[in-house]
Amino acid sequence: SGVSQGTREAMNMNKKEVTEIKKLFTKERCCLNRLCGCYVDADKNKVVQFKEAFLSLPEEEIYKYLDIFRKSLSGTLGKNLLNMEFPLEQEMGDGTQKSLLALRDSELKDDVMLDAFYDRMIETYYHPENYLILLVHGSYDIPMKTSDGMEMDDASDYIYNFVLCCLCPVTLSKAGLCYNAETNSIEDRIRDWMVDLPEQGFLFPAFQDRNTDIHRLLYYSKNANELCPDITEQLLGCVQPIPAGQQKESFQAIIEDTLGEECVYDVVRNIHENLNEMIEEQKENGEPLELDKMQVRKLLERSGAPEANLEQFEKQYDEEIGAQMTVMANNISDTRKFEVKTPQMTVKVSPEQAGLVETRMIDGVPCLVIPLTDEVEVNGIHVHLRDEEVLKNLE
């Protein structure tokens, strides 16, 4: 079997590829061979370091570690799971990508290299409490697939060698009483330092097009809105994408500032509907929809934004997001609801029915008009609508 390195062509790990690697973190399909770790206290001291042949660990421990590793590949692509690319300068000389490649190629057997990695992590990562740095090395003999997607376990062209890093908080278990079977009594429970599921992690190299991509990695953050630039930018040397929540705020600001007085209900509703349509079309590819500056401009244009207002768009986009940065469509649009809000009320409509809600001037007052069917509930009580009531309210 050979090893492919991937190209610099812009491609990201998709959901299927993440799932394929995640399935390796089970006892039945496990291809992990070496585990290393460093327990760090709140004062940044190394308390203990360890290295083990992964499959020689007690079975219960193996299952606990596999839970941690699976967690670091969970969540939503573009939110908790972020595809990150190394800038070209990090692939040369003493660049971060070079040092990660050396770490992977050592199969975590070089103590000097491991120490250097732990030192860099401790120096750059800010965590106010105790935490555990976990590193695991694996070798996946990638099975070939038939044209109908069936795996051929006995046929393989490439081996995917990788390292997975997880940063797990270590916290004191809760105080309380417990039953002691030896003394047959209820007593104060001894509090233990427990390893929690990871808050940050990364998989290197990326697994793209069912192969190795040394130009990228997959980053995990438990909280999609609190990424860790200490790790992503300083330790890994990658360009950190804008957090999911901030992408939505920036997109909303771009629309409001670009459209100005033309930021009317119909245009905003069209943007929402067109965006959801694009997301649905992209679902077939198994990869989340990513929009660059020109694609966002086309979206506004298609949704009825006046040409005169779009002259301001590029400036607004560059200021809010960045000329070369992209946004994930799922981060800027909620495909599950369409919401209209005023200080007095909130109206939520399923996105498919958004076209039913209109704005009209009635007796000189701007109103929101929603057609009613015969299925109307008020505080859970089914009510009947008389024709004269409906007509009277519309007059």
Q: Language-model segments: what does each one mean?
A:
Residues 1-12:
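Short, Lys/Arg-enriched N-terminal segments with co-localized hydrophobic residues
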Residues 14-17:
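Extended alpha-helical interaction scaffolds
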Residues 19-28:
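Short N-terminal leader segment in a subset of presequences, especially plant chloroplast
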Residues 27-29, 33-334:
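Long, hydrophobic alpha/beta structural blocks
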Residues 301-395:
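C-terminal, beta-strand-rich globular interaction domains
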